[in-house]
Amino acid sequence: MFGLLGCTRYFESDKGPRVVLDKTDFVMGYHEHIGILAAPGSGKTTLTRLLCGLDAPDEGDFIGLRGDALPLGANSFILPGLTGEENARMMASLYGLDGDEFSHFCYQLTQLEQCYTDRVSEYSVTMKTHLAFAINLLLPCRLYIADGKLYTGDNATQLRMQAALACQLQQKGLIVLTHNPRLIKEHCHAFGVLLHGKITMCEDLAQATALFEQYQSNQATIQTEDYSFDI
């Protein structure tokens, strides 16, 4: 099993501790594909970092091992002074993988063509994201975590990436954190909502969407009231 038990994560602010996750429980099997609806600023990135073992909770327990989960599309490991090919081969070497096969896969999936041998510092944001996605797909892990989105680029690029991910998901799990119900409908079979620092699992996507939309509606009402005034 993998996840969090009674985990709290907070950050200090001028107004005191800001609680992002509040004694939340989230446990799953390694082959499950779970979509969690979450509004911007609700703690998606904080949750991703905890589940990937990059941060430790202030309270509670992390179930699993560091390296079990990989943040899909994260590109902080890519070195801008190296070419795309050099970055791919470097990561293959670090994990003891075949450099030729690894690099060939990244070249084929990204279709960067001649740019593959250019320095990453010359890449656009989208090109760098595509390279990171390809590299992450081949790194050893037991499940992927997507924070916000899965793919970028034109339709052809997204179809290639979707097919490559589908192959990996035959043996690996997936967690998608997003505000877009359509994204998790395509890739997940269990659904939840991140609200008020806790994850609530739902019976189906319809229930999760209804709960999420109700929360957004309530937040919009609160914001409207905050800006109201008497004339």
Curated annotation (Swiss-Prot):
One GO BP: polysaccharide transport
Record-linked SUPFAM superfamilies: P-loop containing nucleoside triphosphate hydrolases
Membrane topology: Peripheral membrane protein
Domain of life: Bacteria
One annotated Gene Ontology cellular component of this protein: plasma membrane
Listed InterPro entries: ABC_transporter-like_ATP-bd, ABC_transpr_TagH-like, Bact_Polysacc_Export_ATP-bd, P-loop_NTPase
Keyword list, A-Z: ATP-binding, Cell inner membrane, Cell membrane, Membrane, Nucleotide-binding, Polysaccharide transport, Sugar transport, Transport
Annotated compartments: Cell inner membrane
Domain ABC transporter stretches: 5-221
Molecular function, one GO term: ATP binding
Binding-site residues for ATP, renumbered to this chain: A38, A39, P40, G41, S42, G43, K44, T45
Main localization of the protein described in the UniProt heading: membrane
Its biological purpose: May form an ATP-driven Vi polysaccharide export apparatus, in association with the VexA, VexB and VexD proteins.
Family: Belongs to the ABC transporter superfamily.
Protein name (Swiss-Prot/TrEMBL): Vi polysaccharide export ATP-binding protein VexC
Source organism: Salmonella typhi
